[in-house]
Amino acid sequence: MQLNPSEISELIKSRIQGLEASADVRNQGTVISVTDGIVRIHGLSDVMQGEMLEFPGNTFGLALNLERDSVGAVILGEYEHISEGDVVKTTGRILEVPVGPELVGRVVDALGNPIDGKGPVNAKLTDAIEKIAPGVIWRKSVSQPVQTGIKSIDAMVPIGRGQRELIIGDRQCGKTAVAIDAIINQKGKDLVCIYVAIGQKASSIMNVVRKLEETGAMEYTIVVAASASDSAAMQYLAPYAGCTMGEYFRDRGQDALIIYDDLTKQAWAYRQISLLLRRPPGREAYPGDVFYLHSRLLERAARVSEEYVEKFTNGEVKGKSGSLTALPVIETQAGDVTAFVPTNVISITDGQIFLETDLFNAGIRPAINAGVSVSRVGGAAQTKVVKKLSGGIRTDLAQYRELAAFAQFASDLDEATRKQLERGRRVTELLKQPQYQPLQVWELAVSLYAANNGYLDDLDVKQVLPFEKGLRDNLKTSHADLIKRIEDTKDLSKDDEGALRAAIESFKKSGAY
């Protein structure tokens, strides 16, 4: 086809007129220095606090320090290829992570990238990792239980949906075991679990994932892992990422449980970042805002009202309240709960479960110190049957501890004191429990009933646990209807109490334990 010169010029003119030249206006800066994952940048005049920055090689960073003539940023991931003079661009975006049901059953890093070798996550939505907690008006009081399946917790330190309950203790005294048991016990209870591992060995995280898979708990669990080999930035961000994933379910009228294991390591990572950014150190070299670091995270765990859920989902979900329950873990040094981070988190949470090394070494596991462990709001959420039966246990243990300390110095004890000591020994034995074997509500109720009504008093201490197990097995085989009634009503009626008493007495007479 031949075109004459005039047609060619017309064609070029029309193409030029139809051209839409779009310019990508972005602020640029230059890297001044790179040290230990911290970058100083000159020339980023309109950057926001917490904004994502784009570095060469598809690497991103987070702007944390905004100073007069430079910006201090932390790099997310590898930083070996970044050097002085590199160009940095603003993105105009706050850090976001993928959220949604697609993450359930997966192991991801602090940015939501899969690290379990099972392919991409394919989440349809993302959400900001830093969000403001729901206001007072949108919250509901805690009234539904989270059953951990651990006798001493469900009986004496009950946890409710939307509560923040701290698990605190020295290293190697069973903190993670308590948290994992709580996850395993949520099978079939319509509760999504999120386990955030911060600063742990990769092998330890793998063991937890393997155990969750073996027990079928990965079907409703998300694992967010920032191991000890990951950068301080990843360890600092992991809890916020996990919290955002949990909020997805809370805001849509579902229930979620999140475990931060542990926040001491997150505080260490934040201290490291802050000192490298040259922020002024305070007590124990932590920065001044380390309280806010944890308070803004834990305040996001809440039970939200039906109105909040309806407003959030634009009317799609009606009449359902959502909750996010948090179990933060704190590691103490030589039992010192008066250190900076432990006191901070104790004051933020709604109660704490103290685990003691001495109890652990004495074979009392879980090593829960009932005297100083409290649940400030969980009592309202406790199931009727457990609430009815657990009061006596706490009293028995408190009296036993007081008398045990006194009895060391007294040679001759009166009959009443001796009885209380014997009862206390048996209750302490009863509250022992093997790992990965959480109990159902009826099993806990039966154990508490037997202890309260003196059925353990004439047993040898070593016979207590075999008796309890034998009794549970006997009820399963011979009294399934009674078990079903207790499970369905979560209460113990007069008739059921009579049937239970008769069942325990006949089992005890049989001596099959």
Curated annotation (Swiss-Prot):
Gene3D superfamilies: 2.40.30.20, ATP synthase alpha/beta chain, C-terminal domain, P-loop containing nucleotide triphosphate hydrolases. This is ATP synthase subunit alpha. It comes from the Bacteria. GO terms for molecular function: ADP binding; ATP binding; proton-transporting ATP synthase activity, rotational mechanism. It comes from Burkholderia ambifaria (strain MC40-6). HAMAP family: ATP_synth_alpha_bact. The keyword Ion transport applies. F-type ATPases have 2 components, CF(1) - the catalytic core - and CF(0) - the membrane proton channel. CF(1) has five subunits: alpha(3), beta(3), gamma(1), delta(1), epsilon(1). CF(0) has three main subunits: a(1), b(2) and c(9-12). The alpha and beta chains form an alternating ring which encloses part of the gamma chain. CF(1) is attached to CF(0) by a central stalk formed by the gamma and epsilon chains, while a peripheral stalk is formed by the delta and b chains. CDD domains: ATP-synt_F1_alpha_C (cd18113), ATP-synt_F1_alpha_N (cd18116), F1-ATPase_alpha_CD (cd01132). It is a peripheral membrane protein. SUPFAM superfamilies: C-terminal domain of alpha and beta subunits of F1 ATP synthase, N-terminal domain of alpha and beta subunits of F1 ATP synthase, P-loop containing nucleoside triphosphate hydrolases.
